[in-house]
Amino acid sequence: MKFTVFTPTYERAHTLARVYNSLCAQTFSDFEWVIVDDGSTDGTADLVAGWQTENRFPISYEKQPNQGKHIAVNLGATLAQGDLFLIADSDDAFPPNALQIFHDAWTAIPVSDRENFTGVTGLCVDPDGKIIGDKFPADIFDSTPADCYYRHGIKGEKWGFHRTDLIR
C-alpha cells in the first residue's frame, strides 16, 4: 500500500465527512484511511462504522481515552500499513487529484535518491482556491522544513506526507 491517510479526531463527527468525501473522490486509489478517535462521545464511532460497511477503501478505526493529538499520531503511525504517511485533519478537504499529485512527485524522485528525502510538501489553498501562506521559490524545491522557514522565509500552511518508516 502506498499511502496511509491518517486522521486524529476528537468530537468532530460534524466535520469528518469532509475528509471521507475527499477520499472517496480520489483518482489515486492505493491508500488506507486510519482514524484514531481521542475519546469522542459525539457519535464518531457509529459514523465511521457506517463508512466501513460501504467498503469504498480500507478504513481502520481505533478509539483511545482522550490523551491529545500527539499520542493519537503516534498510535496512527504504529497502525499505518502504507509506505507514506499523510495527516488529514478531521475538518480537511482536498482535491480529487491530491494523492495522485503526491504520488507523482514522489515517484519522480529516483529510487536511489529517495532515502535522502523524508517526504513531499505542497501548498494549501482556501475554499476559493487562494494559496494560504507563501509560495515556494520554484515548482520543485528540495529543502528541509527549517531551511524553508529560516533561510527562505517561507511561512503559512503547507500539507504533505512523510515516509512512514521515519514517522515511527
Predicted regions and their residues:
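Nucleotide-sugar donor-binding/catalytic module of glycosyltransferases
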Residues: 1-168
